[in-house]
Amino acid sequence: MVAHAGAISVRLLADRVGLTGELSSALTRRGFAAGHDRGRVLVDVATMITAGGEAIADIDTLRHQAQVLGPVASAPTVWRTLYELTPARLRRMEKARARVRSRVWGLLPDGRPPTATAAGVPLDPDLVVLDVDATLVLAHSEKEGATGTRKKTFGFHPIGVWCDNTTELLALQLRPGNAGSNTVTDHIDVLTAAIAQLPAAHRRQLLVRADGAGASHGLLDWLTGLDAKRGYRVGYSVGFAITEPVRQAICLVPAAAWQVALNADGDVREHADVAELTGLLDPTVLASWPPGMRVIVRREHPHPGAPLTLFEHRDGWRYQAFVTNTESGQLAFLEARHRAHARVEDRIRHAKDTGLGRLPSREYAINQAWLACVTLAADLTAWLRLHALPDSLKTCEPKALRYRLLHVPARLTRGGRRRHLRLPESWPWAVAVLDTFTRVMAIPAPG
């Protein structure tokens, strides 16, 4: 019997798209012959994480499948591999990921990623949407870099960038728990790494979304500079703090200027409106921000128990503002497009269920290497959805995907000089599992 036989499809996918080979080439060291190919080891770790592994010792779940997969590295070898991932090797690893991603996207229809949507409406087919956000990861023991956090917990505060079109986790940076939510250099560094992951042909038309933590002069100036480059269109949609000048501008909005807001599906949202404040703000306030920045505010009747400021208590509305450099479009649509950034919370939750939620080592460098494997696992999951999963499995949460596909058992048989994996006929998703394997094997091997 082979447990978790469905996870073999993830490993096969890594081989078919060329990830294993690219990582092997990137991590080869002259004059050093490793007992286990380092690219294969990292793919096995990513496969283990995708299948639900939380600790390096969980690599034994793949070693159990040696009759199908061949030799699999032991836990000590995995530890050594992660220890060997110096910053220089991590950079080579990221370049390998980018080359593979270019090939994976090239295999999609028309050679482009799925079109992002907002308010139930497709955005520009050429637009790539990047969502940047940070999250807290708790540490339950002393670890290097683990500190007290802003929420009075103990752990780390990594920051990542997700591609909304494909759900890929493009970049992930480990930070101490006391790292700021609005640290400009961290935002710029992780966005630079994320953009470098995109195929060159898809870097020229971007939309960067962030919550209020990204509303810093440095980040918006940097994005404006990218937008000013010839041939580039870089938009942003970033949360904005409700300060006293913003409150004064809200008081100046005529009643007729408020427009109805939209739900995520594009329907009218009751008791919610949007308005633009750009022309109502004190010019001295806007002078310090990049030219072309628009300030848009949304108001909504507060939900029971919602925390309100004194201004909101008095006014009877709850306000949220954001800024964008998009020149055209209805205010309601721009606001709905910004609120679609909330999808990143699902991406973070999935990442925490796929390796991010538990860091294995006391050493900071090894935990950063572990996060690099988490990005590999996220890539493989996203690519599995894009290229192999049938419709019945594409929207599954990680836990459901494991139960239905990755953890299905199979019986290994031999005949005609071939090995066969035989699935239980009673498995409700047996057809979907077979369909997934068939589609993975149909991916053309790298030239």
Which residues fall in each region the model found?
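Dynamic "connector" segments at or just before major functional cores
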Residues: 1-155, 160-180, 185-201, 385, ...
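Short amphipathic alpha-helical "interface-anchor" segments enriched in bulky aromatics
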Residues: 13, 59, 331-382
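Short secondary-structure boundary/capping segments
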Residues: 85, 144-148, 222-227, 251-257
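Flexible loop/turn segments at secondary-structure boundaries
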Residues: 137-139, 168, 178-181, 214-218, ...
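Domain-level cores of phosphate- or acyl-group-handling catalytic modules
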Residues: 181, 185-245
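An anionic, glycine-rich sequence signature occurring as long contiguous blocks
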Residues: 232-352, 435-447
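Basic, amphipathic alpha-helical segments enriched in Lys/Arg and hydrophobic/aromatic residues
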Residues: 357-430
